[in-house]
């Protein structure tokens, strides 16, 4: 195989783009060169075994069900290679075919969203090695010294009229929050070269009093907080001045080390709100975990004046990863109807979702009702902290419930403040057992979906945006979610120049994601979420979408109970969208 992935073989073959497209009508993306095709492959799906053909490109693997030489478009299985977690070969050619049977030689694809696809090949005639080698090479480009598909794709794609990289501007967002006109808060550029904190954005906002203490004071703050992630502003109510700030854990250690600068800084945050009697600190971790972190040099705020501390009991990335695995085991490939609720309970997934929602609701109550400021952190401040600040801000500020505002929120609270997308997803890396991988962002989207269920009229977008965003999170077609920080993404890799933003696609396809029930006037208020466990649901449309026994399949020969109602609902929503578009044109 050369660098382009070209192969030759008796059964598997490298075919020209025009030949493949003519035979299967496969629409290729820019730079999506064809790598390999393999005939006489069988897919083992929830509905049975289906013979067909595999086509591998630089971006995806496509399986097409064949019937007498005819390919059915509705049975096209399309898997972006960025979603692949690992490929596992099954069976060996040295084993007797008669003993093994036709179903025991092939390979299994395990995806990062926990979907599993099993394929078998004919051991006598197939070229499984080239299939798996091609998949491994392009599913894990970083492990094979290849560029990410996002950069290859962008190099051959004309820039869209609406450039998603330009939607978020820290300066513009802070202006929206009234910071330039505030005497109490100041946007500072001490991190303009990312030398103060490599995982923080280029600019951030701190109390003016803290900045006037001088740069040595700010640097002292960085020395006392994990990864130099000092307490900074995320959001402020311009009327009450109640604010949400975020940071990482203080490095108190076993000895209980203190920092006069850090304590003064938190007092400055409290004093920036005249209504504030105390600064509530919400530590996302379970108390026992926070105490154990002291042995590693971390810790929590024990001796701060007027700064009560509450532990939210939200578990770490390892617990979350295991919990989602358990949930999906109960949903795919088949559901054990008798044991489903037991399996759901044992997964504890909804319990974890509830813990996060409860924490966000607590922050909203203190900021909106009590008019008090809050400070939120976990260990390093890039996982649970981002979940909590984002969900609280969505409830408090209707701007973040619009499509544009949601883009700004994700760019600010997740991308610019250093959520480690690269490590949590494992982009381009074949080390599937990496303990740093965890569905933290998926969990955030689940929490948001729960809120959208309670307030369907309050959001300009539907769950389709969340699902599309999660798919592209793995697919690596866009640069938005690549790498671990703003510094790496924008300064080192220059993704804003070398890749396309996912938000460009969203803005070009706004109609696809627009919520016809969105009420502009009614949606401007704070929404008060009920985090009760009995009101939470499993996000079937996302987690179980590959299970046709749960989600209605598209295959014409399978009649699923309720399928006609799903089609009617979609038709009605399309009609509502058309009427909404017509009404907007009339009022324009």
From Swiss-Prot:
Phosphate binds at residues 379, 381-384. It is a peripheral membrane protein. Disruption phenotype: RNAi-mediated knockdown causes an increase in PI3P levels in intracellular vesicles. Also causes an increase in germline cell corpse engulfment, although corpses fail to be cleared. RNAi-mediated knockdown in ced-1, ced-6, ced-2, ced-10 or ced-7 mutant background partially restores cell corpses engulfment. A 1,2-diacyl-sn-glycero-3-phospho-(1D-myo-inositol-3-phosphate) binds at residues 293, 316-317, 379-384, 424. CDD domains: PH-GRAM_MTM-like (cd13223). One of its GO terms (cellular component) is plasma membrane. It catalyses: a 1,2-diacyl-sn-glycero-3-phospho-(1D-myo-inositol-3,5-bisphosphate) + H2O = a 1,2-diacyl-sn-glycero-3-phospho-(1D-myo-inositol-5-phosphate) + phosphate; a 1,2-diacyl-sn-glycero-3-phospho-(1D-myo-inositol-3-phosphate) + H2O = a 1,2-diacyl-sn-glycero-3-phospho-(1D-myo-inositol) + phosphate; 1,2-dioctanoyl-sn-glycero-3-phospho-(1-D-myo-inositol-3-phosphate) + H2O = 1,2-dioctanoyl-sn-glycero-3-phospho-(1D-myo-inositol) + phosphate. The active site is at residue 378. This is Phosphatidylinositol-3,5-bisphosphate 3-phosphatase mtm-1. It comes from Caenorhabditis elegans. PANTHER family: MYOTUBULARIN-RELATED, PHOSPHATIDYLINOSITOL-3,5-BISPHOSPHATE 3-PHOSPHATASE. It is an enzyme of class 3 (hydrolase). A 1,2-diacyl-sn-glycero-3-phospho-(1D-myo-inositol-3,5-bisphosphate) binds at residues 293, 316-317, 379-384, 420, 424. Keywords: Cell membrane, Cell projection, Coiled coil, Hydrolase, Lipid metabolism, Membrane, Phagocytosis.
């Amino acid at each position: 195989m050369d660098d382009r992935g070209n192969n030759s073989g008796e059964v598997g073959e490298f075919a020209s783009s025009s030949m493949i497209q003519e035979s299967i009508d496969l629409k290729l993306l820019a730079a999506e060169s064809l790598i390999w095709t393999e005939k006489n492959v069988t897919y083992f799906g929830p509905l049975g075994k289906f013979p067909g053909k595999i086509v591998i490109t630089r971006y995806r693997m496509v399986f097409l069900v064949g019937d007498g030489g005819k390919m059915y478009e509705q049975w096209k299985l399309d898997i972006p290679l960025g979603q692949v977690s690992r490929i596992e070969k099954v069976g060996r050619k040295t084993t007797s075919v008669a003993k093994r049977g036709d179903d025991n030689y092939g390979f299994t694809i395990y995806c990062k969203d926990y979907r599993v696809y099993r394929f078998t090949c004919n051991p006598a005639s197939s070229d499984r090695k080239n299939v798996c080698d091609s998949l491994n090479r392009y599913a894990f480009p970083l492990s094979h010294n290849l560029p990410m598909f996002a950069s290859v794709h962008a190099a051959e794609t004309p820039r869209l009229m609406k450039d998603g990289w330009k939607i978020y501007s820290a300066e513009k967002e802070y202006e929206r929050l009234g910071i330039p006109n505030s005497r109490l808060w100041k946007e500072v550029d001490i991190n303009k070269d990312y030398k103060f904190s490599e995982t923080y954005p280029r600019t951030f906002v701190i109390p003016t009093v803290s900045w006037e203490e001088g740069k040595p004071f700010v640097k002292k703050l960085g020395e006392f907080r994990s990864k130099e992630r000092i307490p900074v502003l995320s959001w402020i109510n311009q009327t009450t001045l109640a604010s949400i700030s975020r940071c990482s854990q203080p490095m108190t250690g076993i000895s209980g080390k203190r920092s006069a600068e850090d304590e003064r800084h938190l007092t400055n945050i409290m004093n920036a709100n005249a209504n504030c009697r105390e600064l509530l600190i919400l530590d996302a971790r379970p108390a026992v975990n926070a105490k154990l972190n002291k042995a590693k040099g971390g810790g929590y705020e024990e001796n701060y004046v007027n700064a009560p501390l509450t532990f939210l009991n939200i578990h770490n990335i390892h617990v979350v990863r295991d919990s989602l695995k358990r949930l999906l085991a109960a949903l795919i490939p088949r559901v054990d109807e008798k044991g489903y609720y037991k399996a759901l309970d044992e997964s504890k997934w909804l319990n974890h979702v509830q813990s996060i929602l409860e924490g966000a609701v607590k922050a909203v109550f203190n900021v909106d009702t009590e008019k008090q400021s809050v400070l939120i952190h976990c260990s390093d401040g890039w996982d649970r902290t981002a979940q909590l600040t984002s969900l609280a801000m969505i409830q408090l500020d209707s701007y973040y419930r619009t499509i544009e505002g949601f883009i700004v929120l994700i760019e600010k609270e997740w991308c610019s403040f250093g959520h480690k997308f690269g490590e949590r997803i494992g982009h381009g890396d074949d080390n599937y057992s990496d303990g740093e991988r965890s569905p933290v962002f998926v969990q955030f989207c689940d929490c948001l979906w729960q809120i959208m269920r309670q307030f369907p009229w309050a959001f300009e977008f539907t769950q389709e945006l969340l699902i599309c965003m999660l798919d592209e999170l793995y697919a690596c077609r866009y640069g938005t979610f690549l790498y671990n920080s703003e510094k790496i993404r924008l300064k080192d890799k220059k993704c804003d120049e070398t890749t396309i933003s996912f938000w460009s696609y969203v803005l070009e396809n706004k109609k696809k994601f627009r919520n016809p029930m969105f009420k502009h006037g009614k949606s401007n208020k704070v929404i008060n979420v009920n985090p009760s466990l009995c009101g939470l649901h499993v996000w079937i449309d996302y987690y179980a979408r590959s299970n046709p026994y749960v989600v209605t399949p598209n295959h014409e020969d399978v009649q699923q109970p309720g399928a006609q109602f799903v089609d009617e609902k979609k038709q009605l929503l399309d009609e509502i969208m058309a009427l909404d578009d017509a009404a907007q044109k009339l009022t324009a």
